[in-house]
């Protein structure tokens, strides 16, 4: 049986998971932060699969809000790492972001002026989003 740490090490060695210009640190960050486990293939997503998952989620959200035909060059630029979307959206795109879009935000701010605001602060923090506040 392959342990999870060994599986990550094996995934790092797979040449077809990443574009040729990626260094080992970039591969590790992708695997540890943004790549999702694929039960069907018994391995983590490649960079292309991560970008596809993000793009499919973004396209579905855009279509649901009347924005058809997103420019595919955006997806290509993300794949080439010429531009990057919110890394939180890259990490959580799919069912997690569909359940609650708070998880896609990098940070937020809240005026902590009531018990309700404190509850909101805790909720946002539990979704993994940083919160700045004032009292």
Task: State what each model feature region is.
Residues 1-135:
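Extended catalytic cores of very large enzyme megasubunits
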């Amino acid at each position: 049986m392959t342990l999870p740490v060994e599986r990550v090490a094996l995934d790092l060695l797979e040449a077809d998971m990443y574009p040729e210009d990626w260094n080992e640190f970039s591969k590790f960050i992708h695997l540890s932060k943004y790549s999702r486990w694929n039960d069907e293939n018994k391995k983590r997503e490649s960079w292309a699969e991560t970008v596809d998952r993000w793009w499919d989620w973004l396209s579905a959200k855009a279509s649901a809000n009347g924005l058809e035909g997103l420019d595919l060059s955006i997806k290509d630029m993300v794949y080439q790492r010429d531009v990057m979307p919110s890394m939180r959206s890259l990490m959580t795109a799919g069912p997690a972001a569909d359940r609650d879009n708070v998880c896609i935000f990098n940070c937020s701010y809240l005026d902590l002026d009531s018990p309700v605001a404190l509850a909101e602060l805790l909720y946002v923090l539990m979704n993994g989003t940083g919160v700045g506040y004032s009292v």
